[in-house]
């Protein structure tokens, strides 16, 4: 596709993207069942508490987290419940509740801009807040190696359940959204800035700033991508005017 100058995008769960109302004029590659497995690279029965796990890019985070919990593997609880896949989690250095992928990532196998398959260490991936070298390039993540640890299945499941309860309590899961809308500006919290600007409940068409959590723009039923863009542009303008802080989208726009 690159040689033929055909535009393309690779997605896993597609949970953190906003697609233009006109669609995407190119090829959409979904990493499906052929990229949704995992394996232990170390015997979890040996004397070491450390466990290395290799997971394919299309593996859903919640599915992997639940299977790891059943096997008594801890350290992945923070990611269990994030609506995404391994590939996207590496690309964005996904994180929640005090954990980030950079804390557990050893390396990732990628296809680079020249079509060469490479194994990049965590340092080479340049993981930062919701970004990586993958996000800054046209690299495609194929799989990731994670460093986790042994634990008690019941304790791990309990931790996962507690985090799931927090998500249900604080996040507007009752409405469709593309997840957290804005990245956290250094020294601030995007949701607090938006709320302090008086924008909770603010709407454009069917898109609305969640009244439950101002960090989410939700679809109240008939939102278009245009509605979402108009609303996020307005939010950025108001926050800049009131607080002098620039907000950057965490949601990835496609086809614009």
Language-model segments: residues:
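Anion-binding (especially nucleotide phosphate/pyrophosphate-binding) glycine-rich loop
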Residues: 1-86
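Gly/Ser/Thr-rich helix-start
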Residues: 13-15, 24-27, 59, 82-89, ...
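Structural signature of FAD isoalloxazine-binding scaffolds in flavoprotein oxidoreductases
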Residues: 18-37, 91-121, 136-143
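Short coil/turn segments at secondary-structure junctions
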Residues: 47-48, 92, 219-220
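Hydrophobic, well-ordered secondary-structure segments
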Residues: 61, 65, 79, 83-87, ...
């Amino acid at each position: 596709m690159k040689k033929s100058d055909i535009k393309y995008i690779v997605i896993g769960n597609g949970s953190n993207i906003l697609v233009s109302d006109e669609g995407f004029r190119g090829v959409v590659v979904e990493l499906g069942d052929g990229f949704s497995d995992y394996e232990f690279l170390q015997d979890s029965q040996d004397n070491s508490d450390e466990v290395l796990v290799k997971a394919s890019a299309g593996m859903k985070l919640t599915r992997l987290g639940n299977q790891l919990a059943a096997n008594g593997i801890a350290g992945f609880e923070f990611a269990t419940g994030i609506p995404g896949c391994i590939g996207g989690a590496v690309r964005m250095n996904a994180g929640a509740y005090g954990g980030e992928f950079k804390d557990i990532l050893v390396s990732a196998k990628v296809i680079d801009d020249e079509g060469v398959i490479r194994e990049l260490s965590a340092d080479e991936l340049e993981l930062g807040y919701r970004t990586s070298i993958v996000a800054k390039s046209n690299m495609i993540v194929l799989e990731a190696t994670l460093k986790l640890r042994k634990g008690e299945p019941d304790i791990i499941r309990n931790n996962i359940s507690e985090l799931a309860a927090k998500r249900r309590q604080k996040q507007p899961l009752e409405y469709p959204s593309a997840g957290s809308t804005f990245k956290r500006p250094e020294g601030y919290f995007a949701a607090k800035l938006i709320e302090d600007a008086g924008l909770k409940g603010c709407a454009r068409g069917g898109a609305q700033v969640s009244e439950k959590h101002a960090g989410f723009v939700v679809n109240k039923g008939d939102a278009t991508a245009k509605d979402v863009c108009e609303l996020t542009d307005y939010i950025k303008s108001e926050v800049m005017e009131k607080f002098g802080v620039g907000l950057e989208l965490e949601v990835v726009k496609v086809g614009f």
